[in-house]
Regions:
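Glycine-rich nucleophile elbow surrounding the catalytic serine of serine-hydrolase chemistry
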Residues: 169, 261, 279-291
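Conserved alpha/beta-hydrolase "acid-adjacent" motif
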Residues: 509-514
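Catalytic-loop region of hydrolases
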Residues: 2-10, 14, 27-221, 227, ...
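A catalytic-pocket lid/entrance helix-loop region that shapes and gates access to the active site
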Residues: 206-218, 289-352, 399-414, 418-424
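Histidine-bearing beta->alpha loop at or near hydrolase active sites
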Residues: 532-538
Length: 568
């Protein structure tokens, strides 16, 4: 939706929703008490979107990197080229960054924190630096009774984690989720979280204060007349201008390619020859980008809840709308079987009653228990979408919908607030601001203005009768972004890389299963692991088949056979 890619510590919530924010300028995050690695286990969970010759040694954007290859890779769409690797040798101009010494200091109740520098612009490293923050959970003593290959085995180095977004804090994610990782993985890896540039503790981008964000999340995203269109455009312009004013030059250097290059600097600084990595949602796009740029430095890579980098922003947003429709159908089918379902006794009735509820809230926003705030249609839609990220939120959604039909919008507003990780004091974290900044830089805007959106709405509604119109208008923000996109759609082959495990969930709302199939097919060494189930992402959600396959790979390098299926 509007800025999402996961914590009852702001970490896991913002991280899991962030793990799946909406493409049009959003990905998603969630508020949870993580009980398993990288999975949603609390109130919120998260969509994403992704993405010249450099003195620093190669392209500083996906577009520049892809331009090196004039031939589409594999079954790429017309005009979509391959992301080409950077030179294997570290350029002289970047040697000082790769030669830094990390100073890990105790922090945050049992963790270790550090900072290091990267160039603002890899094409011109002399032009100034950014300071990035990382945290690690040092490897624990092996438990002889733990999982595959753990007891007595040697250390494997660092395992870099990213929860998604873009905009999810990997620092917060590691601190929230480290204790839930497999004991064998914890015994052989330091778990490391790097907040990407512009995110969390790494030179974070901010755009609006809490009061203005409340207004932004409430604005009508299904405008019925010119006045409502003008109000939506004004809100998008205010958001974009706030980012420009407060971020300055950084706004043009927050792309995924640059973030992947930052990860390579950290890989070298922790002393690893190859990067080992688990990325979720948008984190899969970041990890795939790393593999494409540095295939010879790619170690054991797990991409869970995968994005398809060959999609442009229009195609990505439209297919993502279809993903949420699929998730809604699963919810509606389940709801219709339950006594407390407030939407009727058939899937068709559930859809009709949800549409009627949205229309009623659009005409007359509902009162809530939150200091005079009223629930708007935009927030009602966001609340429903939030619950599609994980089926453990479905009971809460049933209650919220029943309350809304009775005239109380409190439950849906709380779900909407958890999507954005809004604090009880009315403040918002950096998540949504970074989400928009990265998405609008990685891909050209899908629309030039409101007229383009209006023309596209029928196609979006065909993909998603429930959410298509909303998600088309949500994608308008990047049309007013003050910085031109530097990236473009591309395939990622990562020729010569070790096996890369791509995990897809069949009814994933934020990253549709077809995206995982596409990414696994693009990667020369891709191995598709399928989880037949609901919710966003699969690893760490207590499916023994998925968790066992991923843990065996991380611990012993034994990648699952391509096409392996788990779940129902």
């Amino acid at each position: 939706m509007r800025a999402e890619r996961d914590r009852h510590t702001t970490a896991v919530a913002a991280l899991l929703a962030a793990a799946g924010l909406l493409l049009g300028g959003c990905s998603s995050a969630a508020s949870t008490t993580a009980s398993t690695p990288g999975s949603a286990s609390s109130d919120t969970v998260g969509s994403t979107a992704a993405q010249g010759p450099a003195a620093g040694g190669g392209p500083s954007s996906a577009a520049a990197a892809a331009s090196a290859s004039g031939t589409p890779a594999g079954d790429a769409r017309p005009g979509v080229t391959a992301l080409e690797p950077l030179p294997a040798a570290v350029p002289t101009a970047l040697a000082p960054y790769y030669g830094q010494k990390l100073s890990w200091q105790p922090c945050d109740d049992g963790f270790e924190c550090t900072t290091f520098k990267v160039p603002l612009d890899y094409a011109h490293p002399e032009g100034g630096d950014l300071v990035l923050s990382a945290v690690r959970a040092p490897a624990l003593p092996a438990d002889p009774g733990s999982g595959p290959g753990s007891a007595g085995a040697g250390r494997l180095g660092s395992l870099l984690l990213n929860p998604g977004g873009p905009g999810g804090s990997a620092v917060e994610y590691v601190e929230a989720a480290a204790s839930s990782f497999d004991s064998g993985v914890r015994a052989r890896y330091d778990l490391v979280g790097l907040d990407p540039r512009g995110v969390g503790r790494s030179s974070p981008v901010t755009c609006l204060n809490g009061e203005r964000m409340d207004a932004y999340t409430a604005v009508d995203i299904t405008p019925d007349d010119q006045a409502e269109i003008d109000a939506l455009v004004a809100a998008d312009k205010e958001f974009a201008e706030g980012c420009r004013r407060q971020a300055g030059d950084r706004l043009g250097h927050l792309g995924t390619v640059e973030a992947a290059r930052d990860m390579d600097v950290l890989r070298a600084l922790v002393g690893d020859e190859r990067l080992n990595y688990v990325g979720k949602s948008y984190g899969t796009f970041l990890g795939a980008t790393y593999a494409g740029l540095f295939p010879s430095r790619t170690g054991r890579i797990v991409l869970d809840g995968a994005m398809d980098p060959s999609l442009d922003s229009l195609g990505g947003n439209r297919t993502q709308a279809g993903g949420f429709e699929t998730a809604w159908a699963a919810f509606a089918k389940d709801c219709a079987k339950r006594e407390d379902c407030p939407l009727g006794r058939t899937e068709q009735q559930a859809g009709e009653q949800l549409t009627a509820l949205f229309q009623a809230v659009d005409a007359r926003p509902l009162p809530t228990a939150d200091s005079g705030r009223r629930l708007t249609e935009a927030q009602a839609t966001t609340g429903v979408i939030q619950a599609m990220y994980a089926d453990f939120l479905w009971p809460r959604l049933r209650t919220a919908l029943a309350d809304a039909k009775a005239g109380d919008g409190t439950g849906l507003l709380k779900l909407s607030d958890s999507y954005y990780d809004r604090g009880a004091d009315g403040s918002y974290p950096n998540l949504m601001f970074a989400n928009m900044a990265v998405n609008c830089l990685d891909l050209p805007a899908p629309f030039g203005g409101p007229a383009d959106v209006q023309r596209a709405v029928p196609d979006f509604e065909q993909s998603s009768p429930r959410f298509g119109r909303d998600m088309a208008w949500m994608a308008l923000t990047c049309s007013y972004w003050p910085v031109r996109a530097t990236g473009s759609a591309h395939t990622v082959r990562a020729a010569g890389a070790a096996p890369i495990v791509v995990v897809g969930t069949t009814r994933d709302p934020a990253t549709p299963y077809a995206w995982a199939q596409a990414l696994a097919g693009q990667l020369e060494s891709g191995r598709l692991l399928t989880y037949d189930g609901d919710g966003h992402t699969a690893y760490g959600r207590r499916d023994a088949c998925v968790d066992g396959a991923v843990n065996r790979y991380l611990l012993g390098g034994d990648a699952p056979e391509n096409g392996k299926r788990c779940g129902a």
